[in-house]
Amino acid sequence: VVIDRISGNALQKQGIDPAAMDARREINGFTRSEAAVVSPRNSEHVEDNFNDAVYSGARFGLSYIINEDWDVLVQHTQQTLDTEGVFAYDPTVEGESSAIRFQSDENSDEFGLTTWTLNGRLEKLDVVYTGGYLDREIDTLTDYTGYTNGGLFSAYYVCTHYETPDNPDDARCLDPSKYYKEDTTSTRLTHELRFSTTMDTPWQLTAGVFYDEQEVGSVGQFKIASPEIFENLASSWNALAGDRGINSDGGPFSPEISFVNDVTHTIEQIAVFGQLGYEITDTLTATIGARWYQIDDIYRGATSTRDVTSRLEAYGQGVLDPAVYDGLGLDGQGVVDAIQDGSLEIGLLDGDGVLTVDDTIFKFGLDWKVNENVLLFANYSEGFRPPVTNRLGGDAAANDTGAFADFRVPVYSTTDTLDNYEIGLKGDFLDGILRVNATGYYSEISDLQTSRFDPANISFLVFTDNVGDAEVKGIDADITWLATDNLVINAAFSVLDTELVSINPELEGIAAGVGSELPYSADFSGNISARYFFELDGGKEGYVNASLTYTGDRLAGMVMNAYAMEDATRLIYGTGSGLKIKDEGDEFKGATYPGADGETIRGGRYIQESYVIGNVSVGMTYQNWKVEAFVDNVFDKSAILNIDTQQYTPKVVTNRPRTIGLRFSYDYY
């Protein structure tokens, strides 16, 4: 039933009754060869404590004092992380530590990071040059069976209804097990050169230049279609549509691979920055800063159905010949019409298909030293996130009805910008035993970026879009109290009020509406810790440390698809997830079908409920060594860190269980 409705009633259109097929499932007593619905098997993957992680690595640093004015520091970190399993549980299974998987999940992550810093003086100038180089490789194999519950073409990939149009009773839906395999390599090189004045004058100047180049190359292989129906896809489906910018040999790939995504994403940034501070009086200082930047977002490569490089070049060259876009796998006339009416933006691309943006952002500040112990400040600053090119920009929605009529994947998301206003204080009080840092702020976010994944209606690949505008109001504070000579208490808290103030019309009824809270933002969060020191015999010092951390309720994601997830979960597992939902709309327009009860599916988002985590430790130090026993998550609380809905049934990412351990360190120098 789930496969049929998510596929636009593909089975019913062939005269097949999905409910009758479900009744003839393998688990209902039919053999695997005669069952109308063949269930996936995962008994070979069942085990306790299946999510293993093994870390190994090394770090070293070398510092050299060249002379009294110059010194250099070089550091290198090498690390490998190998994991098996997943770190999210299925809420439909009893307890909070079990996951349902039909494919082994494996991940290997290896990186080397080298950084360098040169400090020096040139007359009245302090000079800092710093840089870094990262080389990283990630190999991933993950269960992709969840696509069956949310992919528009699920019925086509696993059911035989197209082969039995004259005999509906012979139709079968075969084992839907799927996987996704990705090999990713990434490099990043950064340089920054900064000068600061040290003259005894009322003004101070800092200026510099920054360069950043990062490249990510990935080859992703999707096993989606049933190999019993599609016996050899190497010659028909999975060959790449282009060869420029790819990281593989172009195929053919394994015969069970349905689609391949082979792309190279390069981002180059150069920036020039400066800040001028001026002491208006002995107690009042004003600052002004500016940063000019230029970013090139370069996307190259191909998928099994799209030549990404050629498509972006055509957009950048302003091609308006429908035949060109027809040859690139698009509906040519529709694309040209969208470009001409402005609904498909391409103006930021150059003739090579490179997305280039540049701008200048500013900041202003005013500091007032009320006395030797108290500083008040007010700041205004601007920020941004650069635009992102989409590999399938221009594609029409796979489901061209309802809220998705005339929708096209944007060629790129535009820059989202931040205007931030803040006031605050930093001060020592009560003769220095109480220190308070507090900030109140108001932020305006324009053209807020969000990632979208909607295989039921648009595309089975993630893309970025702009959801609308938002406002954030908040207060942050941290407090340190020297309660006694031996007891130090630290506390911090954050209060947030977030609101979506406008929304992209294409997302109305899909994303949360105007006035809604932003996701992942707790109204209140805070922590408090206490550390008590005591003397021991022989010059040793002991300590006891305890802390509590509270995080309030947060909403999961921008899309209000929780009720749709619950409806699918009940049909698949026979029970709901038990997760809380905030009701936010009479209709979720991302579901183009009624619920199992025949009613319209409402809009809502999952609530990631509040939690408290406690940690304790006791330790001892003596000269160069330190030993500590600790208990993290002392109450063994299973917290909801994130609720993932991309598998069309919710999965809950949780924290580590109670962990007891011993640490030992020795400083030798």
Model-derived segments and spans:
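Structural signature of Gram-negative outer-membrane beta-barrels, strongest in the C-terminal barrel
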Residues: 63-67, 195-198, 208-212, 263-444
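Repeated loop/turn-to-beta-strand initiation elements of outer-membrane beta-barrel proteins
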Residues: 69-72, 124-127, 202-205, 283-286, ...
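Membrane-embedded beta-barrel scaffold of Gram-negative outer-membrane proteins
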Residues: 117-144, 369-385, 391-394, 412-475, ...
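Gram-negative outer-membrane beta-barrel transporters
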Residues: 282-286, 435-444, 463-560, 663-669
